Amino acid sequence: MTVQTDKRPAAIRVVIPFVFRHWLQQPGRAAIVAGGLLGATAADLFMPIFSGRLVDALTLGASDAAARHAAFVAFGGIVALGLMSMVLRLTGLQAIVPFTLKTMSDVSRDAFARVQRFSTDWHANSFAGSTVRKVTRGMWALDLLNDTILMALLPSLLVLVGSMVLLGLHWPVLGAVIAVGTVIYVSMTMAFSVNYIAPAARVSNAWDTKVGGTLADALTCNAVVKSFGAEAREDARLAGVIGRWRTRVRRTWYRYNYTSTAQLVVLLCFRGSVIGGAILLWIAGRATPGDVTYVLTSYYIIHAYLRDVGMHINNLQRSVNDMEELVAIHGEPIGIADAPDAKPIDIQGGRIVFDDVTFHYGGHRAPLYDGLSVEIRAGERVGLVGRSGSGKTTFVKLVQRLYDVSGGKILIDGQDIAQATQHSLRSQIAIVQQEPILFHRTLAENIAYGRPGASMAAIEQAARLANAHDFILRLPKGYGTLVGERGVKLSGGERQRVALARAFLADAPVLILDEATSSLDSESEGLIQQAMERLMKGRTSIVIAHRLS
């Protein structure tokens, strides 16, 4: 098992614009969040000024009336700024909750909608578990990213720039020291994060996705694992994948540690420069004890924000890396897309025409069909017989437009299916597969899947026509029985009859039966053949089989 390291754009250049586009869908909330949190930070920013004035007032002694007045004014300013900070911060925090939740909901819903519309080939070549992991990991990473930018980095930026300006107005040298130190620290942190941590994090995330895919693969095929007594073999397979994942994650985490150490070294030098500069100003008589207090208080606020900026930039990079695969989903081509002027198709009789159709699968040089012309009359029953790999299932997939033809066209009732919307086409074609797939939902929900909102009476009538009603009533909860993942709680014959009931209820003018009785016992086959005979009446029916019998 390998992980490809394709040359994609830096994750941060792709993810951040993606997130900002979602922010712009909630401009009001975004403004309240940013305004509240930045306002609270601005209040904190002016706190050292009043602290310095309070110290200067106290050094004059309590007997001085002007000093007492100055002390009370400074005290009042500190309290007022504290209250303002508290109210504004609460406002921002209250607004960020619905803001982030809606963004997370939109991102996950959009990703799911896009994955649902990817081509059959895409799904055949993807692990379902890996895809789920990409979406859920990216959704929760968005929570961290929102918090990091709105609650941490923006306030930090305001503190750093504001402190530099305020101190620079009094002592330009100190303002310059803070500016240079901040630029060095932030630049170094970003360089380490993007060029040192991010490449390792990208690889570890790819292996995290592999772990999810391996788990899903084994759990989905658990019946096969048990039938071969292969539990230990699957344990070993997962252990191998986890071992490689652990190696990659360990490397990433160590890089975080090395980066943190480098940040602490820069902060130590920065601290010495600022505090030393304040002492020199005091020695030179250019700063009072209150001024020194102001500088020290400002520095420790800056220090706290700078120290946290390192952590926040690391968190930003981590969340960006975790979102990268989710965002990449939106960059993948759909595969089979509706034409810009596509219209709903109206199928009445169900006459199907293959007009000089050429088709080959991607990566195959030789075409499977080369100039194929076939006509199936409305209401006609047609059998497709042949060995495995001869193109029987491909034929019906082309009718459903799960693939696009390489040449020629396919018409239904004289309408080119390439110019029809996929939803309207497939909703008028019912299919019963050799291995019917059921959702882990109730029997009633599975039968009604092709006709949402169908009444219970219609569901039961479809089940009767499919010879499924009697066995359903024998189940503990009847039509309310959950069938298990992919219908695992039902036998093969029962699943097939539920699939037939689903086709009955859909009442589509075109019917496809794909090896519907090939793997059933004689009793189940007899019941299903009776139901199939009823189902095919009055419909254009394509029946796939290995042999004529």
Functional labels for PLM-detected ranges:
Residues A62, L166-I184, N195, R255-E324, ...:
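Helix-loop-helix
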Residues T120, V224, E332-G335, I459, ...:
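Hydrophobic patch in the ABC ATPase nucleotide-binding domain
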Residues A30-T91, G168-A176, G272, G276, ...:
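Transmembrane helix-loop-helix hairpins at lipid-water interfaces of multipass membrane proteins
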Residues A111, V115, V225, L326, ...:
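Helix-loop junctions and hydrophobic alpha-helical segments within the transmembrane domains
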